[in-house]
From Swiss-Prot:
InterPro entries linked: ATP_synth_F0_asu (IPR000568), ATP_synth_F0_asu_AS (IPR023011), ATP_synth_F0_asu_bact/mt (IPR045083), F0_ATP_A_sf (IPR035908)
Parts of the chain that traverse the membrane: 26-46, 84-104, 114-134, 143-163, 193-213, 216-236
The organism's taxonomic lineage, starting at the top: Bacteria, Pseudomonadati, Pseudomonadota, Alphaproteobacteria, Hyphomicrobiales
Protein name (record): ATP synthase subunit a
Annotated Pfam families: ATP-synt_A
Molecular function terms from GO: proton-transporting ATP synthase activity, rotational mechanism
Organism: Sinorhizobium fredii (strain NBRC 101917 / NGR234)
SUPFAM superfamilies for the chain: F1F0 ATP synthase subunit A
Gene3D superfamilies: ATP synthase, F0 complex, subunit A
Subunit structure, as described in the record: F-type ATPases have 2 components, CF(1) - the catalytic core - and CF(0) - the membrane proton channel. CF(1) has five subunits: alpha(3), beta(3), gamma(1), delta(1), epsilon(1). CF(0) has three main subunits: a(1), b(2) and c(9-12). The alpha and beta chains form an alternating ring which encloses part of the gamma chain. CF(1) is attached to CF(0) by a central stalk formed by the gamma and epsilon chains, while a peripheral stalk is formed by the delta and b chains.
Length: 250
């Protein structure tokens, strides 16, 4: 079972809880979601609790992260979109921290679970819909009517726009889930290959050198992917929020 590259993604119950026939068990996924929030919040607290005129290196990391997301949101949704900064920043930090924690041996990768990434995506799209109707009423529906479309093509174009909008939670969640799942499976396969070859003595160790180099390279690439996936999720969130703030802008 330990050689199965998908074994690392199994959700196991830590504290079984069942209420009214519904399973509310505390699992390893639950544990690492709590750990992700704790690590992210703890990092931000420790690096910003003693704010100095001349920032320390760690304080600079927090400040750069803050400005990075702020500028992304201003570019994606305009100055009016800054009201969503706490949400976008929290999503970015949660996904980034979860991705990085998942890189450690025997740690659970929360973002490799489609139910987690889909919940995050539904939260984003739900926020877009609720705020869009709250701010613009039925004017929010202008989002589905692009400018300059001939009347004869309007039903077809509106249908395509609605389907495209409703597919956003799927594309947003699957992109993150699939990248993290594929990356970790690839790492597990190469690492298992190295371990298997090493068991054949000196000749096997010699043959394991190339797979070992590949494993190290893939590990470095996976750390980059961990950041890029958090970045992409945040960028797309900003773009979707722009539809709620400026529904008739396209």
């Amino acid at each position: 079972m330990s050689n199965d590259p998908t074994h690392q993604f199994l959700v196991n119950k830590i504290v079984p809880i069942e209420i009214g026939g519904i399973d509310f068990s505390f699992t390893n996924a639950s544990l690492f979601m709590v750990a992700t929030v704790g690590v992210a919040a703890g990092f931000l607290y420790l690096t910003t609790s003693q704010r100095g005129v001349i920032p320390t290196r760690m304080q600079s990391v927090s400040e750069v992260s803050y400005e990075f997301i702020a500028s992304m949101l201003r570019e994606g949704a305009g100055s009016h979109g800054m009201k969503f900064f706490p949400m976008v920043f929290s999503l970015f930090m949660f996904i980034l921290t979860a991705n990085l924690l998942g890189m450690f041996p025997y740690f659970f990768t929360v973002t490799s679970q489609i139910i987690v990434t889909f919940a995050l995506a539904v939260f984003v799209i739900g926020t877009v819909i609720l705020y869009g109707f709250y701010k613009h009423g039925f004017g929010f529906l202008k989002l589905f009517v692009p400018h300059g479309v001939p009347g004869a093509l309007l039903p077809l174009v509106v249908s395509i726009e609605v389907i495209s909008f409703l597919s956003r939670p799927i594309s947003l969640s699957v992109r993150l889930f699939a990248n993290m799942l594929a990356g970790h499976i690839t790492l597990k396969v190469f690492a298992g290959f190295v371990a298997s070859l090493s068991a054949f003595g000196a000749l096997g160790i010699g043959g394991a050198i190339l797979p070992l180099i590949m494993t190290v390279a893939l590990t470095g690439l996976e750390f980059l992917v961990a950041f890029l996936q958090a970045y992409v999720f945040a960028v797309l969130t900003c773009m979707y929020l722009n539809d709620a703030v400026h529904p008739g802008s396209h």
